């Protein structure tokens, strides 16, 4: 009797790092409310890694991101704070054989909105899945030359509680 063990290709880290960004944006007719203008002050911090997986050694992306957005009504200076922690992870990467990759992504993590007193007024602790299409630049295993082509859509809607953001925020800042 001969026992044959086929080895699996091991994962290799292609790239990893951390990121930080801060910016502000002015949003008119916020939440489709005519005349409601808010300033959104955004802080983003996170880390990411790209690893190869499977027999084809295709790249899989994973990130952990914290986002803090303060929405301030420019007329009244009333504000709310949205705090989100997201883990995004490629669940499946498919080489379509035509120079493109289809990627199924899982996004999960809590998002909460707090009023000025610190009370939570809206939450979304769920997860959802979506697919994207990338041009692989002729090199399926090298993500450095990939280009985003298209958002293919939500595959699985958000699970769990999903409070209406605008229904909670507009009264709090008006």
Task: Please tell me what each predicted stretch does.
Residues 11-174:
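Beta-strand-enriched cores of mature, soluble protein domains
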Residues 1-11:
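Secretory targeting and sorting signals
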């Amino acid at each position: 009797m001969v026992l044959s063990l086929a080895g699996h290709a091991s994962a290799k880290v292609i790239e990893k790092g951390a990121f930080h960004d801060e910016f502000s944006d002015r949003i008119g007719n916020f939440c489709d409310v005519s005349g409601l203008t808010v300033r959104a002050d955004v802080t983003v911090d996170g880390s990411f890694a790209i690893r190869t997986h499977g027999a084809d050694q295709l790249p899989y992306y994973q990130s952990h991101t914290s986002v803090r957005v303060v929405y301030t009504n420019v007329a009244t200076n009333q504000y709310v704070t949205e705090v989100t922690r997201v883990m995004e992870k490629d669940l499946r990467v498919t080489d379509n054989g035509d120079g493109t990759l289809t990627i199924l992504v899982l996004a999960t993590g809590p998002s909460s909105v707090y009023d000025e007193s610190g009370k939570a007024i809206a939450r979304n602790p769920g997860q959802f899945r979506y697919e994207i299409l990338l041009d692989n630049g002729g090199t399926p295993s090298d993500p450095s030359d990939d280009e985003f082509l298209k958002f293919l859509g939500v595959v699985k809607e958000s699970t769990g509680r999903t409070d209406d953001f605008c229904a909670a925020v507009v009264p709090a800042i008006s």
